[in-house]
Amino acid sequence: MFYLLAGLGNPGKKYELSRHNAGFMIVDAIASEFYFPSFRERHNALISIGNIKSHRVILVKPWTFMNNSGAPIMSIASLYKIPLDNIIIFHDEVEINFCTIRVKKSGGNAGHNGLKSIDNLLGKDYWRVRFGIGRPINKTNLKIDLSYYVLSQFHNIKAVNNTILNIVEHITLLLEKKPSMFMEKVKNLIKYEDIPTE
């Protein structure tokens, strides 16, 4: 039985390290750590099939823009007959503090357009790993446009990379359906802020 691990993001070099591409960054790190083969394009997505210990896994990066993420995920899940309980979506979440990780199954999409697209095509009964990017830190009392914020690059990329490494290190707990244990393991011991580190 396959597991489908999909990271949400936007294609293109200009978006590579943006907050909205946290999902892509996590999937890339998983692929690197577990020696997955190079991604190839199928069904409007980049996919790679490999193993995480004893688990057979398909990594997916929808190669559509965020608002259309659901279609390639639905196509791949249908092709490989993957049940919703074996689908894990990694995505950014503005309502969660920076570099805080939350896991849930089902529930609302909190206005996230990538999740809306998936919900519309697959329903809601899949797993979500929510990577906190927080809301903009505004010390000047100027209004910061949320779409500009999520499409901008992280400032504290070191904290992001450390958090992603924690996710990758404990990913098997998610595959074993142990979300509470996973969240405990990936909890950062210090509170990070997404501000320039230099």
UniProtKB/Swiss-Prot annotation:
Is tRNA-binding found in the keyword set? yes
Q: What are the recorded Gene Ontology BP terms?
A: protein quality control for misfolded or incompletely synthesized proteins; rescue of stalled ribosome
Q: Where is the active site?
A: H20 (proton acceptor)
SUPFAM superfamilies registered for this protein in UniProt: Peptidyl-tRNA hydrolase-like (SSF53178)
Catalytic activity line of the entry: an N-acyl-L-alpha-aminoacyl-tRNA + H2O = an N-acyl-L-amino acid + a tRNA + H(+)
EC top class, in one word? hydrolase
According to its UniProt record, where is this protein located? Answer: Cytoplasm
EC number, UniProt record: 3.1.1.29
Residues the record lists as binding tRNA: Y15, F65, N67, N113
Q: Where is this site: Stabilizes the basic form of H active site to accept a proton?
A: D92
The site annotation (Discriminates between blocked and unblocked aminoacyl-tRNA) covers N10
One GO cellular component this record assigns the protein to is: cytoplasm
Q: Which domain of life is it from?
A: Bacteria
GO function term, MF aspect, one? peptidyl-tRNA hydrolase activity
Pfam families documented for this protein: Pept_tRNA_hydro
Q: Does the keyword Aminoacyl-tRNA synthetase apply?
A: no
Cited InterPro entries = Pept_tRNA_hydro (IPR001328), Pept_tRNA_hydro_CS (IPR018171), Pept_tRNA_hydro_sf (IPR036416)
Keywords recorded for this protein, A-Z: Cytoplasm, Hydrolase, RNA-binding, tRNA-binding
Q: What does this protein do?
A: Hydrolyzes ribosome-free peptidyl-tRNAs (with 1 or more amino acids incorporated), which drop off the ribosome during protein synthesis, or as a result of ribosome stalling. Catalyzes the release of premature peptidyl moieties from peptidyl-tRNA molecules trapped in stalled 50S ribosomal subunits, and thus maintains levels of free tRNAs and 50S ribosomes.
Q: Which family does it belong to?
A: Belongs to the PTH family.
Name the HAMAP family for this protein: Pept_tRNA_hydro_bact (MF_00083)
User: What does the record note on quaternary structure?
Assistant: Monomer.
> Know the name of this protein?
Peptidyl-tRNA hydrolase
Gene name of the encoded protein: pth
